[in-house]
Amino acid sequence: MADWKLRRQILRAACFLLVLTGLLAVYIVYLTTWDADPLAENPLNARTAAARADIWRGSIIDDKGNVLAETGSDGQRRYPYGEVMAPVTGYNGDKIGSAGIEAHANRELLGLTADMGRLGPISQLLQADRGNDVHLTIDADVQQAAYKALQGRKGAIVVLDANTGGVIAMVSLPSYDPNNIESEWKALSQAESSPLLNRAVQGLYPPGSTIKPLIADEALSTGTVTESDTFDCTGSLEVGGGQTIKDSSGEVHGRLNIREAIAESCNYTFGTIGMRLGDEKLKDAFHRFGFDREIGGDVLMTKSHLPEFGKLGRGDQAQTAIGQSSLLVTPMHMALLAAAFANGGTIMKPYLIDKVVTPGGVTIASTSPTVWLTATTPDMAARIESYMAGVTDHGTGTAARVSGITVVGKTGTAENSSGKEHAWFIGSAEVGGRRAAFAIIVENGGSGGRTAAPVARLIIEALNKK
């Protein structure tokens, strides 16, 4: 009897050890496959840190060959464009870690791939003493022009190649100088102006009237409104519950159709359309254009904050349709909205890294343009684009016009609970051999037509110099 009990205990122990060994094997497989890249990139990984100390970090280069970040002869990281390019390059510090392309392309800049990192000490023998160069889609000249156009005002600018998704410029103000990031870290991290916040992809703002092209697309696509329908704008729309939506400066537009309402940015018309659409169609509109989704890749964009569809009253439906209520979006996503209409209804996934090149000049990785979403039909995209052409031709955005170039757009003046309205302008132009889409926000800038549209003109002129 005693022998039988002993054998049973041994059997149980053996089974337990067998299961434990199996679980350990599964975990090791997981670590060496699915979780390998995060482990290799973890700043606490001593092996990666040791390799980093021995490697001459590669350069970050724009689409024309201009150096945006490099390692000097003293081993210190240098950023020739300083705060102009900080929202793109980010920084790389011994004590504070890294951000931007410096963080996202850390492995490439070190020439230390995750596969080599898994080789352990052997990787030290195979590793070159200089990392790879990372080439971006950014145009330093356009970036500088956009930075200068903001004239030191808080805000953000995004410029995209609508046909590929390549980011041409990404500006955020206030900014910081990555050359001095470690010595100024405490002051920067505590500053009320939030210079470390990349407003282009992390800043959330009410879009104001720049959202109206999306609303028009949904209204026409679903048959909720036709081009022949007219609205009698009295300058003030009662939406129930004691709420009233007014047009800018108390303007009364009279009778107009949806095309004219885009050009004149009529709140009465779009508030009415919002209530006709209702929660489900409004939700569908924002879903089709990706406002409820994350993108991923090397453009780390904060997801939009959408109203709680399904629980909105008529007032919030109307407010959402004019870009207010609880709706908050990033400048990057508004540039993608403009790009959708410029690219026949297709939104390309935005990206910054064009290619990775070894010290010997061999391209070891390159980015191919990728479709992110098909948001609307080519016919509808062309129709909305024609409406936006009216904005710059004779509507609220004439200040964005550039002689000899077709510019389309939409202005926005977004109410802001903490101060003066934000000025917006989104749009696109066929310029410099490509279709460029853009979004501009000037915090507390007031009228989008008077403040943001002239910024668009300066950017288009810079693109035209290519």
Q: Which residues fall in each region the model found?
A:
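Periplasmic/cell-envelope proteins involved in peptidoglycan metabolism and beta-lactam response
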Residues: 1-185, 195, 204-209, 224, ...
